[in-house]
Amino acid sequence: MNNFNDYEHVVIDGFGTLYDKNFIPLEGASRLLDVISDKGILFSNMGSISGLQLKDRLNGKFEFLPRKVITSLDILCRFLISENIKTIYHYGGKRADRTLRNITRIVNSIDKPVNALVFTSLPDDNWIKESQAILRYIYRHRDAKMILANPDRLLPGKHVGLNVGMMFDMLSQNWPRQEFNLSKIEIGIRSI
């Protein structure tokens, strides 16, 4: 195994690297975390939970955990604060919604303009209705900053169906540029 002492930090992905979709450790994952010890930083593109919430889920399943656990939701929150984004329309689940409400105002109506349309995960329910609301918002306001907080499109292993990255692409593409001013920002692995 490489000498990890030569590195200041070792950033590793979670899903498919350390654990499966049920957060069960993969073979060799605990040993790897032991070897990299306090240099380890777990980064997950999850837009639905924070690093603290992910660490809680993993606690007790691994003998050792990285000293730091970060998710795309954590990076999104920092981005919203640093960019002074005060109002958003949120396309995502209730867990992310609760976290985002601590730092910004979430608007439930598409009638008034917001600072950004934020995509964190697939909505818990009524995702077709939520998708239609995004399309109506774009059509009505003609101007939107769209932020994707989970840029994964393809996942390793067996196909699991639609994900929020695919929905973001479907909802944000093919608008005539001369009529619609859409800016797209992806937050995740590229942002660390």
Indicate residue ranges for each PLM-predicted region.
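HAD-like aspartate-dependent phosphatase fold
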Residues: M1-I192
